[in-house]
């Protein structure tokens, strides 16, 4: 999440600093490089060669966005949320199913098609087109039942994420 500002005193060496970041989950240092051609890259740094770096990566077939150093941490937080926090949410939901009597294997197996289907729909139709469920249907009774069944962190996470889902539902159904 570091910006090119980390290269302090770089002008003294007549050099230019850049921060180039793939928006990509690298979970295996020996295999992930094989599909990095699918990654979206961000580039931040000295204006002198920004366009050169952008063209270089676009020449490899990667989409590129130039961002400011001030936005680097917020950009990285968005990436961490959609990647790493999604893993945490999946783990929490598997735990919830285990608490309902599912084996660990069956909890994972049960949620996998739901996660894959929603991920594919989000990618294809964006969040507003992918949204389904009780908040999208304006089914307050089901949402309240869900909240009544939860406690602690699971309840707080459900509430907090529901606020964001409600924004998507309002975009999808502005007439409501």
Question: Where is each model-derived feature located?
Answer:
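A generic, residue-level signal for flexible/boundary positions that often mark functional hotspots
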Residues: 1, 17-20, 61, 125, ...
């Amino acid at each position: 999440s570091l910006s090119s500002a980390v290269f302090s005193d770089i002008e003294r060496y007549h050099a230019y600093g850049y921060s180039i970041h793939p928006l990509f989950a690298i979970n295996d240092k020996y295999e992930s490089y094989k599909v990095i051609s699918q990654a979206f890259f961000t580039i931040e740094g000295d204006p002198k060669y920004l366009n050169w770096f952008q063209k270089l990566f676009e020449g490899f077939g990667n989409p590129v966005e130039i961002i400011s150093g001030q936005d680097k941490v917020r950009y990285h937080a968005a990436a961490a949320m959609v990647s790493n926090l999604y893993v945490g949410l999946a783990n929490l939901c598997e735990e919830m199913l285990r608490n309902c009597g599912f084996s660990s294997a069956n909890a994972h197996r049960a949620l996998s098609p739901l996660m894959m289907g929603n991920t594919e729909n989000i990618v294809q139709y964006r969040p507003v087109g992918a949204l389904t469920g009780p908040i999208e249907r304006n089914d307050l009774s089901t949402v309240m039942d869900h909240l009544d069944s939860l406690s602690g962190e699971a309840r707080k996470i459900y509430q907090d994420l529901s606020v964001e889902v409600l924004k998507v539902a309002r975009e999808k159904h502005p007439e409501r």
